Regions:
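ATPase catalytic-site recognition across NTP-hydrolyzing enzymes
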Residues: 1-64
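Mg2+-dependent endonuclease catalytic cores in nucleic-acid-processing enzymes, primarily RNase H-like
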Residues: 15-16, 33, 37, 78, ...
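Intrinsically disordered or highly flexible coil/loop and linker segments, enriched in small
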Residues: 35-39, 70-71, 117-118, 182, ...
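An active-site-proximal beta-strand-loop segment
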Residues: 62-77
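C-terminal interaction surface of TIR/SEFIR-family domains
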Residues: 207-210
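Conserved RecA-like P-loop NTPase helicase motor core
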Residues: 214-216
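Acidic two-metal-ion nuclease catalytic site recognized across multiple nuclease folds
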Residues: 222-249
């Protein structure tokens, strides 16, 4: 949205303010968009994550935005590192912010460094039909260039045809959160990106009056983990058509 007082609130000033107050306060005071917490998700669980060595694998899932701007009018970019252990999904750390494409690419390497050699990490990036030209024309060349500087990361595009964002988050994540089976890493509680993720969960509503790019990213990671678990379990099978990713980097 746009500020209700653009003459006073320049883009630079708005971004500086947005970084220092909550999304709820920012939307209400500067965007004339009052929000309430807990309409769908009442509480987000923080807890200790198991050592990454205990995981079969981890997934770094990224939700890009086609914007290459750091201003508040653009969508949030997101990239989070998730794992699964003993029936619970864990969000170890991640990033959620308005950033340039160059910074977004760096996030993948930051998550690689966080995981180090403790666990195999699978890297995915959302790539629906609308995003595909941008992914091929912008991100693939950027990842190729960064690979020459910092090493190769194998990234797979998630090309599935997704249901609407709210329904996916409510249907796939709300039950997990309510049952205590989706946990945010308490060691990262002061991380502003993780705080932003918690707030987006709490402000989720059917009208989508506030950003939900973070929860959308987590839903993507959980979905990928579930697909991988189903293939690892002996005798497991999947009903439906398999989607092949033909644009693996």
């Amino acid at each position: 949205g746009r500020s209700t007082w653009p003459e006073k609130n320049t883009e630079e000033r708005i971004r500086r303010i947005e970084q220092t107050i909550s999304t709820k306060a920012f939307q209400q005071e500067y965007m004339n968009n009052p929000l309430s917490e807990g309409e769908v998700i009442k509480e987000v669980i923080w807890g200790k994550c198991p050592p990454m060595q205990r995981l079969q694998f981890a997934v770094a899932y990224a939700d890009p935005s086609p914007s290459n701007a750091r201003n508040k009018a653009s969508s949030f970019k997101a990239d989070f590192l998730l794992g699964y252990c003993d029936g619970t999904f864990y969000v170890y750390t991640g990033f959620l912010d308005h950033v340039t494409n160059d910074e977004f690419v760096d996030w993948f390497y930051n998550l690689r460094d966080y995981a180090s050699e403790r666990v195999q990490v699978y890297y995915f990036i959302e790539n629906n039909s609308l995003q595909d030209p941008f992914y091929e024309q912008v991100f693939l060349p950027m990842f190729a260039a960064r690979a020459r500087e910092r090493g190769f990361i194998g990234i797979t595009p998630d090309c599935r045809c997704k249901p609407p964002k709210f329904e996916r988050i409510e249907g796939n994540l709300e039950p997990l959160i309510r049952q205590g089976r989706l946990v945010l890493n308490i060691d990262e509680r002061e991380n502003p990106h993780m705080k932003r993720l918690e707030e987006q969960f709490l402000l989720l509503n059917r009208q989508m009056k506030s950003p939900a790019d973070g929860p959308d990213c987590i839903e993507g990671g959980v979905w990928i983990i579930n697909q991988k678990i189903s293939t690892l379990n002996e005798g497991s099978y999947t009903i439906g058509q398999r989607v092949r990713a033909s644009k693996r980097f």
